[in-house]
Amino acid sequence: MPISCFKCASKCPARALEKIGKNMTVDEILNEVISDKIFYDTSGGGVTLSGGEVCMFPEWTGNLAAQLKANGINVLIETCGFFDYSKVSEYILPYVDTIFYDIKLFDSQKHKEYCGVYNDSVLSNFVTLHNNMKDFGFSLLPRVPLIPNITDTDDNLSSIAAFLSEENVSKVQLLPYNPTWYNKAEKIGTKPAIMLQELRSFPAKEQIEHAKSFFTDKNINVGGSI
């Protein structure tokens, strides 16, 4: 069973393992963020809460978001959509300005295969957020990562586009695949779980334009690093 508590790092005789990062309280994070508030005020920026999955810790995340908002700092969260909506609604949504919401795979079985869980709650949570975003006052942006032969297939993109169109979503962000992780995996002696040759290259412009067409055909505006 994999060890994820970092106890092995302190015992590693060759010091090959090192824990990166540190535990911080909400107050410690807030103090550090506030020290840079002048930059947020000047640029119109704010704080992005990402992960991991911040919605797995709704009370802690909500506490931080509430204090950020109380200090006039814009709050954005990134989520995979797999969370308990009732808790997120209670603790987080009142203090969020923007939500980036990843929709990777529309087919539930494939979502289970690649992401480890079925996507029923991912899709239903998106619909509920979209229906309630005006009441809470946040904006919601769905995002689709374009992973070669996994998420960028015609079937997947057309299904996601149809789903978003049915919910009257007006904008989506496409995230073109970045292959730089592949070489990093090899350098640390890890064999990538998926050995597709397509995963070694950046997508061609034609591939990205093809992906965009599924959404523009549904009158959905496409943004992102494209």
PLM regions and their residue ranges:
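Iron-sulfur (Fe-S) cluster-binding segments and ferredoxin-like electron-carrier domains
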Residues: 15-21
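Conserved AdoMet/S-adenosylmethionine-binding subsite of the radical SAM
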Residues: 27-186
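Radical SAM enzyme core and accessory elements
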Residues: 217-226
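Conserved dinucleotide-binding and phosphotransfer motif residues
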Residues: 15, 67-71, 218
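Cysteine-centered iron-sulfur cluster-binding motifs in ferredoxin-type domains/subunits
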Residues: 1-15, 53
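A structural motif corresponding to the C-terminal lobe/cap of the Radical SAM core domain
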Residues: 162, 170, 185-214
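Active-site anion-handling motifs in enzyme catalytic cores
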Residues: 24
